[in-house]
Design a protein with these regions (language model features):
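Beta-strand elements of repeat-based all-beta scaffolds
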Residues: 1-16, 20-37, 41-58, 62-79, ...
């Protein structure tokens, strides 16, 4: 990177080998007046007599304006659409409020140490905070009053977190304050080990399964070794960009990277190549697939995509408002879809190419309160103070209600007929029981890695699951106790299923992990072929009949 300065020591030009550059001009006080990039896009800055920024004008002409008090604090910001956000402060400079468009006000309160002790949203709902002597948050109560508690060691490392249901997760650290353990409320522990410079070298899950990591001298990950010994390898260029990834079966994807660290080519293990081209600003201009399909992109001065076209002659154009919200999407085949927004940036209207509109309303906290379809039928939404949906009322007054525990897991759903479905969770927030509106139950058990080990259905029948070291289902035990055995390759593709009666089904894959052969228990074979992009091109059944597929 090269730099140029003027006589006053101001940076006036910077550039790199990738073609990126930036030019600057200044006023007599050393304030930046203009900033121009390699594409000639210029942002301009205007200041008052005190050197405070009054207006920022972006390359597309959109502006943001700023107002200040006598203490040089920003008291108002007006965006490119004229929407004004104002701020107030206490005597020591803590922000007391933020008001959007003179309507939606967020308020903040502080203790004597200038720490935030409460935040109140425009609906009047507040969250509160407590601290220890080192300014660490020890309690956080949300808008519903649900409290999460935190504890720390002498080095201010988080050592425990207790959720709203009273379940505690603990954390352990080494002498260098690196996390070496995490224990769940059910006493299931993940362990971590590091090298001398802080790279993670080993992780052990609650089942005792170990994953190892190896690095080069620059701390780039070079190998990841699974609990079953499967190795994934990574190679890098001198800038630290990944240039190849080799999976456990020895299949390699290769990458080419330009001077701006953009991937310009990806060569798959099957020889298929994807190429990518970029403009001077590093924006993707075009991409070409292995079969020659090309997609092109055009941008406006502030990096919004304004046009997409492809080699199939399909073109879509986009327009935006001054805040960069999409106003319209136009396709020659489909027509134009348009979008409108309120002064807070919420989508309030969406009109399809046939002129049919969906409209939306929001409360001052930005929560959607209603949605009306093109026929004017309205669905209404209500929320609890913490923002969880409590009721959805569809046209005709059909209301569905939701109940939650203190961790905001959904515990009940009451349908419009008044029937209630219930869900029970364990201390790790895993579903252990579901009861439908008719009172029928399904239950679940888990191992220490949170994998489902059994499902008991509504008839009381239980199916059991055992897993290998990669988390693949290895044995399925049905309700009668009969077992099916499953096997996998190094990439965890299912290769063989032996059912309880000894019947064997096998699966074969190519170097892209696409299924290419399926052999059923009667030794009948089905073959599959694919193109370089992974699209299925043919299926040949055991009788020799072939079905072919083409793509546009």
């Amino acid at each position: 990177i090269t730099y140029q300065y003027d006589g006053a020591g101001n940076l006036i030009h910077s550039s790199d080998n990738g073609g990126n550059s930036m030019d600057y001009t200044y006023d007599g006080a050393g304030n930046v007046l203009t900033q121009t990039d390699e594409l000639g896009r210029t942002a301009t800055y205007k200041y008052d007599q005190y050197g405070r920024l009054l207006k920022l004008t972006e390359a597309d002409g959109s502006t943001t304006s700023y107002e200040y008090d006598v203490m040089d604090r920003i008291i108002a910001v007006t965006d490119a659409e004229g929407h004004r956000t104002s701020f107030t402060y206490d005597k020591v400079g803590n922000q007391l409020s933020m008001t959007e468009e003179d309507e939606a006000t967020y308020q903040y309160a502080y203790d004597k140490k200038d720490r935030v002790i409460s935040q109140t949203n425009p609906l009047g709902a507040s969250s509160t905070f407590k601290y220890d002597g080192n300014d660490n948050v020890t309690e956080a109560a949300d808008e519903n009053g649900t409290v999460t508690k935190y504890a720390y060691d002498k080095n201010n490392n988080l050592v425990s977190q207790t959720d709203g249901n009273g379940n505690t997760t603990t954390y352990q650290y080494d002498e260098l304050d690196r996390k070496i353990g995490e224990t769940s409320p059910l006493k299931e522990t993940n362990e971590y080990r590091y090298d001398a410079i802080g790279n993670l070298t080993k992780s052990k899950d609650p089942m005792g399964l170990i994953t190892e990591y190896k690095y080069d001298s620059l701390s780039n990950l070079t190998e990841q070794i699974s609990p079953k010994g499967a190795v994934t390898k990574y190679d890098y260029d001198k800038h630290g960009n990944v240039i190849s990834v080799t999976d456990p079966k020895g299949n390699t994807n290769q990458y080419s990277v330009d001077l701006n660290d953009n991937v310009t080519k990806m060569t798959q293990a099957n020889g298929g190549e994807y190429t990518y081209n970029y403009d001077k600003a590093g924006r993707l201009e075009s991409m070409t697939s292995p079969l020659g399909y090309t997609k092109n992109f055009s941008y406006d001065k502030v990096d919004n995509v304004v046009k997409e076209s492809d080699s199939l002659k399909s073109t879509t154009t986009y327009t935006y408002d001054k805040l960069h919200n999409m106003k319209s999407s136009t396709n020659a085949l489909d027509g134009t879809t348009s979008f409108s927004y309120d002064k807070y940036g919420n989508l309030v209207k969406e009109t399809d190419p046939l002129g049919r509109s969906n409209t939306y309303s929001y409360d001052l906290a930005g929560q959607m309160t209603s949605a009306a379809d093109p026929l004017g039928k309205i669905t209404a939404y209500t929320y609890d103070p913490a923002g969880n949906i409590t009721d959805i009322t569809k046209p005709g007054g059909r209301k569905t209600s939701y109940g939650y525990d203190k961790n905001y897991n959904v515990t009940s759903v009451t349908d419009p007929m008044g029937y209630v479905a219930k869900t029970v969770y364990d201390k790790d927030n895993r579903v252990t029981e579901e009861t439908d509106a008719l009172g029928q139950k399904e239950s679940y058990t888990y191992d220490k890695d949170s994998r489902v080990t059994s499902i008991t259905d509504k008839r009381g029948f239980t199916t059991g699951f055992d897993y290998d070291a990669h988390g693949n289902i290895q044995v399925v035990t049905d309700k009668t106790g009969l077992k099916s055995h499953l096997e996998y390759d190094k990439n965890d593709n299912l290769t063989k299923v032996t059912d309880a009666l000894g019947g064997v089904t096998t699966y074969g894959y190519d170097n892209m992990d696409n299924l290419v052969t399926f052999t059923n228990a009667a030794n009948k074979i089905t073959n599959y072929t694919y193109d370089l992009e992974g699209n299925l091109t043919s299926i040949k059944d055991p009788a020799g009949r072939t079905e072919k597929f083409d793509y546009d």
